Amino acid sequence: MTLDAVGLEVMGHAFASVAEEMGLVLVHSALSPNIRERRDASAALFDADGEMIAQAAHIPVHLGALADAVAAVRKEDPRPGDLFLLNDPYAGGSHLPDLTLIGAIEVDGAVGGYSVVRAHHSDVGGMTPGSMPAGARELYAEGIVIPPVRWTPEVERLLLANVRTPGMRRGDLAAQRAAAMRGAEGVRALASRHGWPALREAARDLLDYAERRTRAVLSRLSTGGGTPLAAMDYLEGDGVSDSDLGIKVRITIADGTFHADFTGTSEAARGNVNCPLAVTRSAVLFVVRTLLPDDVPTNGGVQRALRITAPAGCLVNAERPSAVAAGNVETSQRIADTVFRALADGGLAVPAQGQGTMNNVTFGGPGWTYYETIGGGQGASRGAAGPSAVHVGMSNTRNTPIEVLELEHPLRVRTYALRRGSGGVGEWAGGDGVVREFEVLAPMEATLLTERRRHGPEGAGGGSAGAPGANLVNGAALGAKVTLPLAVGDVVRIETPGGGGWGKRQL
């Protein structure tokens, strides 16, 4: 069957509704504030060939990388009804705290597709609470590494024996299993209503439709046979050294294909800012998705139009055993910024840079861990000021409510406010960042993984840059990426970057 326009809309929303229900089951069942309140989790459906059919509107850095996880599971000869667990960044994962559950959906006695749930767990072992140590030089220092394995109670016992908060992890994993089961139930319900052959063909039609729409847009943006669009941007150190690390990209858009070539990017770092290729692909996919009309379904058809080149062993195509905790959350942001910069230099209308960081904050002590990311300023665009205090780019989480944070952890929030005046000046101003100040109520260890502390987000069209962020403890400035002990009474202050302004300010 070939769906008409109405059929594409109906079936596209039917699949997407199942993915959204998976997400709701997860966040309403999870124990940890990071998943329950911040919603640092994602859900999607894949067909039996490993292409994404539909996703919920969750976390870009998760969603674009899930295809690699499904591909890794398919190599394990999944049987109908099997449930797989993984977090290995070099076998389909992103970074170790992101535990992924993949259910092989049984339809008529065969594997009809996959329900996929990825969620950030606030501890998976390793050398520091939160499993994101700033000074890690190997993957193994960041936590337990799980290749694609069938989930069994014994596998769960092994995992829980290697984490600091086993009760919380057990509850969050149960929520993920429930979400994966809801996905399978939803697909079987659609198959019962429409018939399995028709449903399978509808999924193919949706993939082909998204590919056609994507390639049509890219054909209008073609760079032809001319010089590729090029840009370079930098990371502010790797947690071991403060030296800048370069990310270089050349973009060619031709024959309906978007080719991002990262040749010339820095070699893999000693610290934890390295990216597995799946995360790099996710960042490029995010950029391409912003170029498409809203009604184009975000599925594997869009990914068909992408091509990524990255030398093995470089910063954005790291190899085992490079540490990757910050690569997923910080380097992914810079990859997206760099690709956007190349497009802007080529004359494409893109906004000024947003904060370009997730401002990762991890606290932990005996029997507890806490993780959050903090919003900042978005860049302005031609005709609109940038929003303030929002998550930008590869993140899409909420800020943790103060009441929840203080109720469940030995922390007191002294300040939570807009960082007035931090947005870049222009005809349209960049959004303001955030000030978030924590008072320590018990001895603990903290890790900060942040960016844009030296180089503020750039403006566009003559607008000025947003203010760089700052990390302080008791008023003393810290680096962008640090792990340190904290005593009772210490005050940790995070000032997040403002977004860049757009256009010259009219006097």
Feature-to-residue mapping (PLM):
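Glycine/proline-enriched, intrinsically flexible loops and inter-domain linkers
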Residues: 1-80, 86-107, 111-259, 263-507
